[in-house]
């Protein structure tokens, strides 16, 4: 079952809006930010990833799959589990720490 494989800091290819018929515009990379203890919920909290970004405190630079990109903490969203298509890997441990620090700052405001 897919949800058993889902863990915090995993990077997944997801369908962002299941009702959107434009498949190309609807797929994207996301990293899971939901704590593993809450993986039984029907949806998972994710932060989208992009290769294009402005310099914002809520954007974390990362390297994934030999490409430089950004995790967009300011674009958090809940995605239903059936929208997760394929696990692509996991964030590096240094990036995981930066993500946790950014989440703490983001919600402390």
Can you say where each PLM-predicted feature lies in the sequence?
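Conserved functional hotspots at enzyme active or ligand-binding sites that engage polyanionic ligands
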Residues: 1-109
